[in-house]
């Protein structure tokens, strides 16, 4: 018989840097999950990613207090800021541009995000990511 699911917890945790401090500790503690066990497993799974890259994770907590988790790809906005070499997006994206991304960079981000995005094809994903870039005040070349 399958285990009974008690809760789903969605968090964004820095890759390779999960620790019991907030937001991880309180979110897992209220469901009775072993926090250090999660931190060790998460850090081991994300060691191949760039350290500190915000990584969405969905944790499934079962009634016997065991858990499983699935890591997602980093948010498109984070990948776009990294590609453009900017610290943050523009406060006024229509008038104030803060950086530039090329079509090749958008293609690379779309391929990275392909596993998580529900787009029909790579072109649709590229358009979605280009739209995100424009809404952040980035100029899309190509």
Curated annotation (Swiss-Prot):
PTM comment, free text: One or more lysine residues are methylated.
Task: Please provide the Gene Ontology terms (biological process) for this protein.
Answer: translation
InterPro entries noted in UniProt: Ribosomal_uL11, Ribosomal_uL11_bac-typ, Ribosomal_uL11_C, Ribosomal_uL11_C_sf, Ribosomal_uL11_CS, Ribosomal_uL11_N, Ribosomal_uL11_N_sf
Q: Name the source's superkingdom.
A: Bacteria
Q: Does the keyword Ribonucleoprotein apply?
A: yes
One term under GO cellular component: cytosolic large ribosomal subunit
Q: Which PROSITE patterns match?
A: RIBOSOMAL_L11 (PS00359)
Q: Which GO terms describe its molecular function?
A: large ribosomal subunit rRNA binding; structural constituent of ribosome
Record key words, sorted? Methylation, Ribonucleoprotein, Ribosomal protein, RNA-binding, rRNA-binding
- Subunit composition? Part of the ribosomal stalk of the 50S ribosomal subunit. Interacts with L10 and the large rRNA to form the base of the stalk. L10 forms an elongated spine to which L12 dimers bind in a sequential fashion forming a multimeric L10(L12)X complex.
Briefly state the protein's biological role.
Answer: Forms part of the ribosomal stalk which helps the ribosome interact with GTP-bound translation factors.
Family assignment from sequence similarity: Belongs to the universal ribosomal protein uL11 family.
Could you identify this protein by its name?
Large ribosomal subunit protein uL11
Q: From which organism does this entry originate? A: Vibrio parahaemolyticus serotype O3:K6 (strain RIMD 2210633)
- Cite the source lineage: Bacteria, Pseudomonadati, Pseudomonadota, Gammaproteobacteria, Vibrionales
What gene name is given for the protein in this entry?
rplK
